[in-house]
């Protein structure tokens, strides 16, 4: 499967990006990471901590996809597709995507269905994954789409 196959399946659309958009997305991910660290220091709930860390992951994944010239089509499964698309950037072997998908599902339960189900270990793990994904995405963009990053 390729990004173009995803376009044919109507999961993605081609859309150019530029360094301003990528810088904005990476700054947004950085902001969510700062908020995550503040939530940890302030002892906010593990649900809130995981939600902020997950947002940093999702935004970083969006930056990778946008740097490649694609965006997820609106209308359902946007977060799922954004995470799965990391296969075409930082995770071609799909080593971390299953973990990120579990975190996505955990975040969804905490956001939409129930509260207090996130453990400290899960929140901490999500925070570590967020830092990792953010760094790997920036490194990947610098290597593969240097014209899209300052």
Predicted regions and their residues:
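Terminal alpha-helical segments
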Residues: 1-150
């Amino acid at each position: 499967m390729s990004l173009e196959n995803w376009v044919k399946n109507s999961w993605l659309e081609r859309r150019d990006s530029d360094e301003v958009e990528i810088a904005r997305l990476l700054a947004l991910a950085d902001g969510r990471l700062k908020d995550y660290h503040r939530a940890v220091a302030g002892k906010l709930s593990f649900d809130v901590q995981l939600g902020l860390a997950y947002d940093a992951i999702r935004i970083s994944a969006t930056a990778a996809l946008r740097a490649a010239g694609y965006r997820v089509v609106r209308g359902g499964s946007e977060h799922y597709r954004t995470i799965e698309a990391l296969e075409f950037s930082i995770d071609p072997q799909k080593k971390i995507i299953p973990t990120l998908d579990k975190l996505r599902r955990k975040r969804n339960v905490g956001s939409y269905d129930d509260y207090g189900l996130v453990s400290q270990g899960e929140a901490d793990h999500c925070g570590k994954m967020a830092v990792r994904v953010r760094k790997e995405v920036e490194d990947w963009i610098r290597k593969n789409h240097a014209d899209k990053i300052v």
